[in-house]
Amino acid sequence: RFPARQTDYARLLQGHVHIPQQARFFRADRWRQVGPLDPSFYFAMDYDLWVRLAKVSPLVYHPALWANFRLHGQTKTLSSDDRCYPEMLKVYAREGGKPWGKLPLKARLRPLVYAWLPLKLRLWLRRLI
């Protein structure tokens, strides 16, 4: 199960992305306010959208099960996890993030740690951070 939970603008900028895109709903007026998706992003287009939405409106977490998706070794999320961070860091920099913040630190440390961990352990760790 995806480790979804409440988040906000500040936590998103720290890299706490706990929003499963399959179950994300938002108002059409918010989409008109912040949309569309930025086509320059391939891996972090949803992260960019969540940050822009959180900047103009509170995000509300509902703990009900709204959707399912399959997470396996061939998904972009897992197979190219290291390629998402450079795009997330572009969003972070655009929002005024500092080079010594939590997200840049995670971006540097995660490839070193995750290279040695099996998939199930990586998924378990993801729930903790």
Protein language model features and the residues they cover:
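Conserved nucleotide-sugar donor-binding catalytic segment
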Residues: 1-87, 91
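Membrane-proximal basic amphipathic "stem/tether" segments
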Residues: 93-129
